Amino acid sequence: MVKLAFPRELRLLTPSQFTFVFQQPQRAGTPQITILGRLNSLGHPRIGLTVAKKNVRRAHERNRIKRLTRESFRLRQHELPAMDFVVVAKKGVADLDNRALSEALEKLWRRHCRLARGP
């Protein structure tokens, strides 16, 4: 049976882990959200989130975006390649409802799976 937990080892926690992804990322994005990814040697994917107060003013909106993103990652973690992902929220992401945000994330996860497989 597949475990769908979200333990600590599936998260990017330190600034150096985020910097690793920002140095040479593969990008997949929409006007409201971008997911940066970089292959890791751990054998499983990890995720980090950046939702700036400058782009999403209200705390409850930032929390909603982070919660939906974590849930999307948690459900797809076994389909994703062994990469470190950083999800960057841009202006306008707060205007998306839950369904639109979930659909955008699913599309970006699929795109990263294709990018990881190569040409």
Swiss-Prot record:
Coiled-coil regions listed in the entry: none
GO cellular component term of the entry, any: ribonuclease P complex
Keywords: Endonuclease, Hydrolase, Nuclease, RNA-binding, tRNA processing
InterPro entries reported for this sequence: Ribosomal_Su5_D2-typ_SF, Ribsml_uS5_D2-typ_fold_subgr, RNase_P, RNase_P_CS
Signal peptide positions on this chain: none
Organism superkingdom: Bacteria
Keyword RNA-binding found: yes
EC number: 3.1.26.5
GO biological process entries: tRNA 5'-leader removal
Keyword flag Transit peptide: no
Catalyses which reaction(s): Endonucleolytic cleavage of RNA, removing 5'-extranucleotides from tRNA precursor
GO molecular function terms noted in the UniProt entry: 3'-tRNA processing endoribonuclease activity; ribonuclease P activity; tRNA binding
Pfam families: Ribonuclease_P
HAMAP family found in the cross-reference section: RNase_P
Function noted in UniProt: RNaseP catalyzes the removal of the 5'-leader sequence from pre-tRNA to produce the mature 5'-terminus. It can also cleave other RNA substrates such as 4.5S RNA. The protein component plays an auxiliary but essential role in vivo by binding to the 5'-leader sequence and broadening the substrate specificity of the ribozyme.
Subunit structure: Consists of a catalytic RNA component (M1 or rnpB) and a protein subunit.
Family to which this protein belongs: Belongs to the RnpA family.
Protein name: Ribonuclease P protein component
Organism: Escherichia coli O6:H1 (strain CFT073 / ATCC 700928 / UPEC)
